[in-house]
Regions:
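Flexible mid-to-C-terminal extensions adjoining Fe-S/redox cofactors in radical SAM and related proteins
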Residues: 1-6, 229-230, 234-287
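Canonical Radical SAM [4Fe-4S] cluster-binding loop centered on the CxxxCxxC motif
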Residues: 3-38
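Core AdoMet radical
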Residues: 7, 27-34, 51-65, 79-94, ...
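Residues immediately within or flanking Cys/His clusters that coordinate Zn2+
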Residues: 13, 17, 212, 263-265
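Cys/His-rich zinc-coordinating "finger/knuckle" motifs
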Residues: 23, 27-31, 222, 240, ...
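Acidic (Asp/Glu)-rich catalytic clusters
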Residues: 45-48, 77, 98-106, 127-136
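Distinct, well-ordered alpha-helical segments
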Residues: 67-74, 92-102, 122-127, 155-158
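Radical SAM enzyme [4Fe-4S]-AdoMet core and its adjacent flexible, acidic
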Residues: 109, 113-231, 240
Length: 287
């Protein structure tokens, strides 16, 4: 059984400085951010959590929101919890250095997303390599890459470039608003070359189904949007299920016991890698 790391996935803001063609987040949700008063409410809520949680932040793009570095990160640095971030890594290195300096060994995971519609792979890898030198030995660093159809042969070269630099390459199959993308036969073979035959949730994101497995989301894991709404998991939120209350109105109430997963897709690997899904390490993927 995996150790369960209590985790919150917090969408700190909606605004994003990229507009990727394959982004499944609707443009109407890629806007907005919390006020200074609302940020204080979030921080006060995190301070009430018992034990050591991991607060993994995403957007939009977190660094595109001025309040992220002005208020959120300094505030989290004062709390006992771990901090992680998902970023497109477009922020200047000077800003990224301050981010690392503020959090120190509280920084747990930095997931940087490589979007080839906006950057050159070699330049991106060079920047990530520089950033890596500032991290504590306990901080994990990974380069995420969406497996966009008709680009996969080129991504084999990108994967090699990343790994030659001693960095971790983390492929993600492309998702749609209704599930996962249906690759053609040629691309399916390339997907396997990029992900491996039966990757674990720490090696690739294949958005599998955990239906029927005992799941601790809503108990020791939940997602939080920029408006303060808490949901047991991403898929539950998509179906408007698993609502846990709102941070800004002091109404969040977590579940007290795990339950069997009832969904056909888990779009994010965080619940599995944080030990929330019992038996997820035994999943075998079909060709």
């Amino acid at each position: 059984m995996l150790f369960r790391q209590p985790t919150i996935e917090w969408q700190t803001n909606g605004i994003c400085n990229y507009d990727c063609s394959y982004c499944i987040q609707s443009k109407k949700f890629r806007q907005g951010y919390p006020s200074e008063e609302e940020i204080e409410k979030f921080l006060e809520f995190f301070a009430t959590l018992q034990g050591n949680w991991e607060i993994k932040m995403s957007g939009g793009e977190p660094f595109a929101f001025k309040g992220f570095m002005d208020k959120i990160v300094p505030g989290l640095a004062l709390l006992p919890h771990k901090v992680s971030v998902l970023t497109n890594f477009s922020a200047p290195l000077t800003v990224l250095r301050r981010f690392v300096d503020l959090l120190g060994d509280k920084l747990s995971v930095v997931s940087v997303s490589l979007h080839l519609e906006y950057v050159q792979a070699a330049d991106f890898v060079e920047k990530v390599s520089c950033f890596r030198e500032w991290l504590a030995p306990t901080t994990s660093l990974v380069i995420n890459n969406v497996l966009v159809p008709n680009t996969l042969a080129n991504l084999l070269e990108v994967k090699s470039l990343v790994e030659q630099a001693g960095l971790k390459y983390f492929p993600q199959i492309m998702k749609t608003k209704h599930g996962v993308f249906s690759y053609n036969l040629e691309d399916k073979d390339l997907v396997i070359q990029l992900t491996g035959k039966n990757p674990s949730s720490k090696q690739a994101n294949l958005a599998p189904s955990y239906r029927g497995l005992l799941c601790w989301t809503g108990v020791e894991y939940f997602v939080l949007d920029q408006k303060g709404n808490a949901w047991s998991c991403r898929t539950a939120k998509r179906f408007q299920e698993g609502y846990l209350g709102n941070v800004l109105t002091d109404t969040v109430k977590l579940k007290t016991a795990p339950s069997a997963c009832k969904y056909d897709i888990c779009p994010c690997t965080v619940p599995a890698t944080r030990g929330m899904i019992e038996g997820s390490n035994k999943i075998v993927y079909e060709d």
